[in-house]
Curated annotation (Swiss-Prot):
PANTHER family from the UniProt entry: 54S RIBOSOMAL PROTEIN L1, MITOCHONDRIAL, LARGE RIBOSOMAL SUBUNIT PROTEIN UL1M
Organism name: Gloeothece citriformis (strain PCC 7424)
Annotated gene: rplA
Keywords for this protein: Repressor, Ribonucleoprotein, Ribosomal protein, RNA-binding, rRNA-binding, Translation regulation, tRNA-binding
Protein name, entry field: Large ribosomal subunit protein uL1
GO biological process, one term: translation
Gene3D superfamilies: 3.30.190.20, 3.40.50.790
Subunit structure, as described in the record: Part of the 50S ribosomal subunit.
Domain of life the protein comes from: Bacteria
Disulphide-bridged cysteine pairs: none
Length: 238
């Protein structure tokens, strides 16, 4: 059965030319214009890449640091032992523990957006893989969430660092700010993501790497961004 569209969504949809790939700044102004919910909507980007992640040399998993932040309060949990527990608490971690925290998570406690672990705890954390993996929360060295430098990692994730990966169809889904951000600040963040994706191009990627880029507010319609314009763009963070 076809989903009935709300009047608010139909009005927002009417502002978007579905056959057009917009210049990046124009697309982001349109994202703000079509964010008409009664709350501050999240700015989302969906990038289709020319990769097949079933092959290990075509997988993409890395982190991006958004210069303008994400506009979200990020709750960070840390699994460590000994003096590292106090180090994590002092650095601003919201939840810190050792084996008891692993047990709590195994029993369903998921009150965090980022989970960091020290390398010596990973053999014990490994049993959480089936629970955390599908949620994108499993600590990994590549994602910057397995580390001995807890203070730096906590501060970076609190400030807007975000881990992302291409899904099984080769699409990257990332939240890169809030609709209340200026279009210029959203553009700085979007450009940071584009450069990160280019920098981390999988070695096995063949042919055209970038296929399509769409942005939207979380409750708004999709807006296509001109890929070449985004990649050619030079932005300043000021």
């Amino acid at each position: 059965m076809a989903k009935k569209l709300s009047r608010r969504f139909k009005e927002a949809l009417a502002k978007v030319d579905q056959d057009k790939a917009y210049e990046p700044l124009e697309a982001l102004n349109l994202l703000k214009e079509t964010a008409t919910a009664k709350f501050d909507e999240t700015a989302e980007v969906h990038v289709r890449l020319g990769i097949d992640p079933k092959y290990t040399d075509q997988q993409l998993r890395t982190t991006v640091t958004f210069p303008k932040g994400t506009g979200q309060t990020v709750r960070v949990a840390v699994i460590a032992r000994g003096e590292k527990v106090q180090e994590a608490s002092s650095a601003g971690a919201d939840i810190v523990g050792s084996e008891e925290l692993i047990d709590e998570i195994q029993n369903g406690m998921m009150d965090f957006e980022v989970l960091i672990a020290t390398p010596d705890m990973m053999p014990k954390v490994a049993k959480l893989g089936r629970l955390l993996g599908p949620r994108g929360l499993m600590p990994s060295p590549k994602g910057g969430t397995v580390t001995t430098d807890l203070a730096a990692a906590i501060q970076e994730f609190k400030a807007g660092k975000q881990e992302f990966r291409a899904d099984r169809t080769g699409i990257v889904h990332v939240m890169f700010g809030k609709a209340s951000f200026t279009a210029e600040d959203l553009l700085v963040n979007l450009k940071a993501l584009q450069e990160t994706i280019d920098r981390n191009r999988p070695s096995g990627a063949k042919g055209r790497y970038w296929r399509t880029v769409f942005v939207s507010a979380s409750m708004g319609p999709s807006i296509q961004v001109d890929v070449n314009s985004l990649r050619d763009l030079k932005v300043t963070e000021a």
